[in-house]
């Protein structure tokens, strides 16, 4: 965490930038003056300038260096020179970063700094109180208080960000992160590589990737199926495509299988040797060599398996944040949703709803796809064709609401072909694809055409 002086200096820099934009950009002025209050300013000069700008605006007077200086003199504020206003105007006009970065970005930064400062002050006071009476307070209670305040600060920061409205043009044109910039980069990526995955990742299945974008950054993706149909196999196969073929960083949180079991499935997938043969050790020299080669392949990849994951939602959320921060993962897989416990204990339906909302929020917050496996209710077993529907998602309709993409896997017991149905796609079309599935090696592949 930054020191308090570093936070204050950063806040004063942001105040300076915002007042400069208010001075030269009329479309920014009203918004900035409406969103801020004078007590939020750290620098007394900036606070006085803000008060004067607001007075001039409220009285229909132009906001210029001269008009602001005259009002400051009228209020007998003499601890600041007119040249400070002139420098503010000059920097706002000549600094490319100040001109290109939207005022809403600066406002967001200011709210984050404010939350960071409040949290820093709280931690400082809490440790002082604990050091004065170490025997009267539990260190675990202190940590719990800090954790609660941290969660509150994060929630407050994001609520402030989401509460601020932004014009359509601002969102469209904003510097390097606006909609126009993203569309141009997508076009450049498509022209260069003939694919549409600038801000998304291919699943590795051409038929699916040609029809729609599944693993877009920020997407909350659900893979749902009946037991023993291939949910975990599809997730592992997709993760291998990402980590090995595409050289992406992948996090896999398994609440059901051990790390060793997952790695054996990965080895079976890469070598084409059945999981049963690997378990028995019934391998030829050539097969053992293939296993060793697969080991070298995965050694070069960034595939992180967390099989000792706690079942509590808050601990899983912390683990995901840590994987993103420390290991810079691009995609997270969770196996599976119904094994997670939430502190909302009124009933299981409310628990699942809380879990779904939290994972959806994490995908958006961390700007990565989070793929979560889910069970289906027994209703699908009662239907003759056993084709899954959105209403079959187990325990909560909230999953259907929160998910950006929902994939269903359907396979007849006697068939080696699986139908992958996109039952929901918030940002694209729904469709179906058929893949070949080899359960012995947990591998999905395109169906070979017979000519």
Swiss-Prot record:
Keywords: ATP-binding, DNA replication, DNA-binding, Helicase, Hydrolase, Isomerase, Nucleotide-binding, Plasmid, Primosome. ATP binds at residues 225-232. Pfam families: DnaB (PF00772), DnaB_C (PF03796). The lineage of its organism: Bacteria, Pseudomonadati, Chlamydiota, Chlamydiia, Chlamydiales. Homohexamer. SUPFAM superfamilies: N-terminal domain of DnaB helicase (SSF48024), P-loop containing nucleoside triphosphate hydrolases (SSF52540). Belongs to the helicase family. DnaB subfamily. It catalyses: Couples ATP hydrolysis with the unwinding of duplex DNA at the replication fork by translocating in the 5'-3' direction. This creates two antiparallel DNA single strands (ssDNA). The leading ssDNA polymer is the template for DNA polymerase III holoenzyme which synthesizes a continuous strand; ATP + H2O = ADP + phosphate + H(+). Its EC number is 5.6.2.3. InterPro entries: AAA+_ATPase, DNA_heli_DnaB-like_N_sf, DNA_helicase_DnaB-like_C, DNA_helicase_DnaB-like_N, P-loop_NTPase. A replicative DNA helicase, it participates in initiation and elongation during DNA replication. Travels ahead of the DNA replisome, separating dsDNA into templates for DNA synthesis. A processive ATP-dependent 5'-3' DNA helicase it has DNA-dependent ATPase activity. The plasmid this protein is encoded on is thought to be required for growth within mammalian cells. One of its GO terms (biological process) is DNA replication, synthesis of primer. CDD domains: DnaB_C. Coiled coil: none annotated. Changing residue 267 to V: In plasmid pCTT1. This is Probable plasmid replicative DNA helicase. Changing residue 55 to H: In plasmid pCHL1. Changing residue 188 to V: In plasmid pCHL1. It is an enzyme of class 5 (isomerase).
């Amino acid at each position: 965490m930054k020191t308090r002086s570093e936070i204050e200096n950063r806040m004063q820099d942001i105040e300076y930038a915002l007042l400069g934009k208010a001075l030269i950009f009329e479309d920014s002025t009203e918004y900035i003056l409406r969103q801020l209050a004078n007590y939020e300013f750290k620098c007394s000069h900036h606070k006085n300038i803000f008060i004067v700008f607001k007075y001039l605006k409220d009285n229909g007077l132009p906001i210029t260096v001269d008009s602001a200086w005259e009002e400051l003199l009228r209020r007998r504020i003499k601890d600041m020179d007119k040249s400070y206003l002139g420098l503010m105007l000059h920097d706002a006009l000549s600094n490319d970063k100040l001109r290109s970065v939207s005022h809403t970005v600066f406002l967001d930064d200011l709210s984050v700094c404010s939350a960071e400062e409040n949290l820093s002050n709280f931690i400082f006071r809490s440790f002082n109180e604990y050091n004065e009476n170490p025997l009267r307070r539990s260190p675990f209670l202190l940590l719990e208080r800090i954790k609660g305040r941290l969660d509150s600060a994060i929630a407050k920061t994001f609520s402030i960000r989401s509460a601020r409205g932004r014009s359509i043009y601002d969102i469209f044109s904003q510097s390097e992160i606006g909609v126009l910039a993203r569309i141009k980069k997508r076009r450049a990526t498509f022209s260069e590589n003939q694919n549409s995955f600038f801000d998304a990742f291919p699943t590795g299945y051409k038929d699916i990737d040609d029809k729609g974008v599944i693993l877009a950054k920020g997407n909350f993706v659900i893979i749902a199926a009946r037991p023993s149909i291939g949910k975990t196999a599809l997730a592992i196969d997709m993760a291998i495509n990402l980590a090995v073929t595409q050289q992406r960083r992948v996090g896999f949180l398994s609440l059901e299988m051990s790390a060793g079991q997952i790695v054996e499935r990965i080895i079976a997938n890469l070598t084409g040797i059945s999981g049963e043969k690997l378990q028995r050790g019934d391998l030829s020299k050539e097969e053992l060599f293939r296993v060793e080669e697969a080991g070298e392949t995965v050694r070069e990849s960034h595939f992180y398996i967390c099989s000792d994951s706690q079942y509590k939602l808050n601990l899983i959320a912390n683990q995901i944040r840590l994987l993103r921060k420390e290991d810079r993962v691009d995609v997270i897989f969770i196996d599976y949703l119904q094994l997670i416990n939430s502190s909302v204990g009124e009933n299981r339906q409310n628990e699942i709803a809380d879990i779904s909302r939290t994972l959806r929020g994490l995908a958006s917050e961390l700007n990565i796809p989070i793929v979560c496996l889910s069970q289906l209710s027994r209703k699908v077993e009662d239907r003759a064709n056993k084709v899954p529907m959105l209403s079959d998602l187990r325990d909560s309709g909230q999953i259907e609401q929160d998910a950006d993409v929902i994939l269903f896997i359907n396979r007849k017991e006697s068939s080696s072909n699986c139908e992958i149905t996109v039952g929901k796609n918030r940002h694209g079309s729904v469709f179906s694809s058929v893949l070949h599935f080899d359960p012995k090696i947990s591998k999905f592949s395109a169906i070979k055409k017979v000519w």
